[in-house]
Amino acid sequence: IGRVVYDGITDLANAGVFGEYTFHAGETFTAIAGLRGDWFYGEGFKVSPRVTLKYMPVDEIVIRANGGRGLRYSTPLVDNIGVLSTGKMFTGSYKEHILEDAWTFGGNITYYLPFGASSNTYVSFDFFRTQFAQQMVVDYEQAMNVISFYALDGRQSYTDNYQIDFSVDPVERFNITATFRYTNAKIELDGKGLVEKPMTSQYKGVLNLQYATNLNRWIFD
Protein backbone atom coordinates (compact mmCIF):
# COMPACT_ATOMS: atom_id res chain seq x y z
CA ILE A 1 0.00 0.00 0.00
CA GLY A 2 1.37 3.38 -0.95
CA ARG A 3 2.28 5.87 1.74
CA VAL A 4 0.75 9.36 1.63
CA VAL A 5 3.16 12.13 2.62
CA TYR A 6 1.96 15.68 3.31
CA ASP A 7 4.58 18.41 3.65
CA GLY A 8 2.16 21.14 4.74
CA ILE A 9 2.78 23.28 1.65
CA THR A 10 0.12 24.01 -0.99
CA ASP A 11 -0.25 26.48 -3.83
CA LEU A 12 -3.90 27.26 -3.04
CA ALA A 13 -4.66 30.98 -3.10
CA ASN A 14 -7.60 33.15 -4.04
CA ALA A 15 -8.79 36.70 -3.52
CA GLY A 16 -12.30 37.99 -4.02
CA VAL A 17 -14.81 40.77 -3.68
CA PHE A 18 -18.52 40.48 -2.93
CA GLY A 19 -21.48 42.82 -3.19
CA GLU A 20 -25.22 42.49 -2.77
CA TYR A 21 -28.41 44.49 -3.19
CA THR A 22 -31.56 44.07 -1.10
CA PHE A 23 -35.02 45.07 -2.31
CA HIS A 24 -38.09 45.24 -0.05
CA ALA A 25 -41.71 45.53 -1.16
CA GLY A 26 -43.41 46.18 2.15
CA GLU A 27 -43.35 43.19 4.49
CA THR A 28 -44.53 40.68 1.90
CA PHE A 29 -41.60 40.42 -0.52
CA THR A 30 -37.83 40.60 -0.21
CA ALA A 31 -35.20 39.97 -2.88
CA ILE A 32 -31.45 39.80 -2.34
CA ALA A 33 -29.11 39.66 -5.33
CA GLY A 34 -25.43 39.05 -4.79
CA LEU A 35 -22.38 38.87 -7.03
CA ARG A 36 -18.96 37.61 -6.06
CA GLY A 37 -15.80 37.78 -8.13
CA ASP A 38 -12.77 35.66 -7.24
CA TRP A 39 -9.30 35.23 -8.64
CA PHE A 40 -8.09 31.66 -8.20
CA TYR A 41 -4.44 30.74 -8.52
CA GLY A 42 -4.03 28.75 -11.73
CA GLU A 43 -7.67 29.21 -12.75
CA GLY A 44 -8.06 32.95 -13.27
CA PHE A 45 -11.09 35.13 -12.53
CA LYS A 46 -14.47 33.51 -11.80
CA VAL A 47 -17.88 35.09 -11.14
CA SER A 48 -20.41 33.60 -8.72
CA PRO A 49 -23.93 35.07 -8.78
CA ARG A 50 -26.61 34.27 -6.21
CA VAL A 51 -30.18 35.33 -5.52
CA THR A 52 -32.59 34.87 -2.60
CA LEU A 53 -36.34 35.55 -2.73
CA LYS A 54 -38.82 35.61 0.16
CA TYR A 55 -42.59 36.01 -0.22
CA MET A 56 -45.31 36.07 2.46
CA PRO A 57 -48.76 36.01 0.81
CA VAL A 58 -50.35 35.74 4.28
CA ASP A 59 -48.92 35.82 7.79
CA GLU A 60 -49.06 32.03 8.13
CA ILE A 61 -47.17 31.15 4.92
CA VAL A 62 -43.57 31.93 3.98
CA ILE A 63 -42.19 30.97 0.55
CA ARG A 64 -38.45 31.13 -0.11
CA ALA A 65 -36.41 30.44 -3.23
CA ASN A 66 -32.71 30.79 -3.80
CA GLY A 67 -29.96 29.77 -6.15
CA GLY A 68 -26.36 30.45 -6.90
CA ARG A 69 -22.94 29.24 -7.87
CA GLY A 70 -20.31 27.86 -5.52
CA LEU A 71 -16.58 27.47 -6.17
CA ARG A 72 -13.96 25.84 -3.96
CA TYR A 73 -10.65 24.06 -4.16
CA SER A 74 -10.95 20.36 -3.46
CA THR A 75 -8.77 18.81 -0.75
CA PRO A 76 -9.33 15.15 -1.62
CA LEU A 77 -7.95 13.39 1.44
CA VAL A 78 -9.29 15.94 3.92
CA ASP A 79 -12.74 15.97 2.30
CA ASN A 80 -12.83 12.16 2.35
CA ILE A 81 -10.93 11.44 5.55
CA GLY A 82 -12.56 8.02 5.88
CA VAL A 83 -10.52 6.63 2.98
CA LEU A 84 -7.43 6.67 5.20
CA SER A 85 -8.89 3.87 7.34
CA THR A 86 -9.76 1.56 4.43
CA GLY A 87 -6.26 0.18 3.89
CA LYS A 88 -6.71 0.61 0.14
CA MET A 89 -4.26 2.07 -2.36
CA PHE A 90 -4.95 5.54 -3.79
CA THR A 91 -4.52 6.28 -7.48
CA GLY A 92 -5.12 9.30 -9.67
CA SER A 93 -5.44 12.90 -8.52
CA TYR A 94 -5.59 12.45 -4.75
CA LYS A 95 -2.81 15.02 -4.22
CA GLU A 96 -4.30 17.60 -6.59
CA HIS A 97 -6.65 20.47 -5.75
CA ILE A 98 -9.05 20.96 -8.63
CA LEU A 99 -11.47 23.88 -8.54
CA GLU A 100 -14.90 22.41 -7.90
CA ASP A 101 -17.82 24.24 -9.54
CA ALA A 102 -21.47 23.71 -8.58
CA TRP A 103 -24.84 25.40 -8.99
CA THR A 104 -27.44 25.02 -6.24
CA PHE A 105 -31.07 26.06 -6.50
CA GLY A 106 -34.30 25.26 -4.71
CA GLY A 107 -36.91 26.52 -2.33
CA ASN A 108 -38.84 26.19 0.90
CA ILE A 109 -42.46 26.58 1.95
CA THR A 110 -43.24 27.05 5.65
CA TYR A 111 -46.77 27.00 7.02
CA TYR A 112 -47.32 28.18 10.61
CA LEU A 113 -50.09 26.18 12.24
CA PRO A 114 -52.73 27.67 14.57
CA PHE A 115 -52.18 25.40 17.59
CA GLY A 116 -49.61 24.63 20.25
CA ALA A 117 -48.38 26.60 23.24
CA SER A 118 -46.42 29.09 21.12
CA SER A 119 -46.32 30.62 17.65
CA ASN A 120 -43.48 28.26 16.72
CA THR A 121 -45.71 25.46 15.42
CA TYR A 122 -45.03 24.87 11.74
CA VAL A 123 -44.55 22.39 8.94
CA SER A 124 -42.07 23.08 6.16
CA PHE A 125 -41.09 21.47 2.86
CA ASP A 126 -37.70 21.92 1.17
CA PHE A 127 -36.24 20.95 -2.18
CA PHE A 128 -32.71 21.73 -3.31
CA ARG A 129 -30.62 20.48 -6.22
CA THR A 130 -26.86 20.78 -6.56
CA GLN A 131 -25.58 20.34 -10.12
CA PHE A 132 -21.82 19.93 -10.48
CA ALA A 133 -19.94 21.33 -13.45
CA GLN A 134 -16.61 20.19 -12.01
CA GLN A 135 -15.94 17.93 -9.04
CA MET A 136 -13.32 15.65 -7.54
CA VAL A 137 -14.67 12.13 -8.03
CA VAL A 138 -13.82 9.50 -5.42
CA ASP A 139 -14.32 6.15 -7.17
CA TYR A 140 -14.49 3.11 -4.89
CA GLU A 141 -15.49 0.75 -7.70
CA GLN A 142 -12.50 0.80 -10.07
CA ALA A 143 -10.87 -2.20 -8.35
CA MET A 144 -11.28 -4.13 -5.12
CA ASN A 145 -8.23 -2.72 -3.31
CA VAL A 146 -8.00 0.67 -5.02
CA ILE A 147 -9.70 4.04 -4.55
CA SER A 148 -9.35 6.22 -7.64
CA PHE A 149 -9.47 10.03 -7.61
CA TYR A 150 -10.15 11.98 -10.80
CA ALA A 151 -11.91 15.10 -12.10
CA LEU A 152 -15.53 14.96 -13.27
CA ASP A 153 -14.54 16.57 -16.60
CA GLY A 154 -17.92 16.73 -18.36
CA ARG A 155 -19.57 13.73 -16.71
CA GLN A 156 -22.83 14.08 -14.78
CA SER A 157 -23.08 14.63 -11.04
CA TYR A 158 -26.01 15.99 -9.08
CA THR A 159 -27.73 15.75 -5.71
CA ASP A 160 -31.44 16.28 -5.04
CA ASN A 161 -32.54 16.81 -1.42
CA TYR A 162 -36.17 16.64 -0.28
CA GLN A 163 -36.90 17.50 3.35
CA ILE A 164 -39.95 17.90 5.59
CA ASP A 165 -39.85 19.43 9.08
CA PHE A 166 -42.51 19.63 11.78
CA SER A 167 -42.18 21.55 15.03
CA VAL A 168 -44.66 22.06 17.88
CA ASP A 169 -44.67 23.18 21.51
CA PRO A 170 -47.45 21.02 23.03
CA VAL A 171 -46.97 22.77 26.38
CA GLU A 172 -44.95 25.78 27.43
CA ARG A 173 -41.15 25.25 27.25
CA PHE A 174 -41.47 21.77 25.71
CA ASN A 175 -40.67 21.41 22.01
CA ILE A 176 -40.99 18.46 19.64
CA THR A 177 -39.22 18.63 16.28
CA ALA A 178 -39.28 15.91 13.62
CA THR A 179 -37.30 15.95 10.38
CA PHE A 180 -37.18 13.55 7.45
CA ARG A 181 -34.88 13.91 4.44
CA TYR A 182 -34.53 11.95 1.22
CA THR A 183 -31.37 12.35 -0.85
CA ASN A 184 -31.07 11.30 -4.48
CA ALA A 185 -27.37 11.59 -5.35
CA LYS A 186 -26.10 10.40 -8.74
CA ILE A 187 -22.63 10.51 -10.26
CA GLU A 188 -21.18 9.26 -13.53
CA LEU A 189 -18.17 7.05 -12.81
CA ASP A 190 -15.51 6.29 -15.38
CA GLY A 191 -16.63 3.24 -17.36
CA LYS A 192 -19.77 2.63 -15.27
CA GLY A 193 -22.18 5.37 -16.31
CA LEU A 194 -24.58 7.16 -13.97
CA VAL A 195 -24.84 5.38 -10.59
CA GLU A 196 -25.88 6.10 -7.02
CA LYS A 197 -23.16 8.17 -5.39
CA PRO A 198 -21.14 5.87 -3.10
CA MET A 199 -21.09 6.47 0.66
CA THR A 200 -24.30 8.52 0.58
CA SER A 201 -27.24 7.86 2.90
CA GLN A 202 -30.56 8.15 1.06
CA TYR A 203 -32.85 8.39 4.08
CA LYS A 204 -32.34 10.37 7.26
CA GLY A 205 -34.74 11.10 10.09
CA VAL A 206 -34.42 13.01 13.35
CA LEU A 207 -36.78 13.29 16.31
CA ASN A 208 -35.80 15.82 18.96
CA LEU A 209 -37.53 16.45 22.29
CA GLN A 210 -36.46 19.54 24.19
CA TYR A 211 -37.51 20.87 27.57
CA ALA A 212 -36.34 24.18 29.03
CA THR A 213 -36.75 25.31 32.62
CA ASN A 214 -37.84 28.82 33.52
CA LEU A 215 -35.63 31.51 31.94
CA ASN A 216 -33.84 28.74 30.00
CA ARG A 217 -31.50 28.08 32.91
CA TRP A 218 -31.50 24.38 32.04
CA ILE A 219 -32.24 22.87 28.64
CA PHE A 220 -32.72 19.11 28.22
CA ASP A 221 -32.65 17.36 24.82
Each model region followed by its residue ranges:
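Gram-negative outer-membrane beta-barrel transporters
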Residues: 24-28, 123, 128-131, 152-221
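Outer-membrane beta-barrel translocator domains and adjoining extracellular loop/strand segments
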Residues: 1-5, 43-49, 76-82, 89-91, ...
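Residue-level signature of outer-membrane beta-barrel architecture
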Residues: 21-23, 37, 45, 55, ...
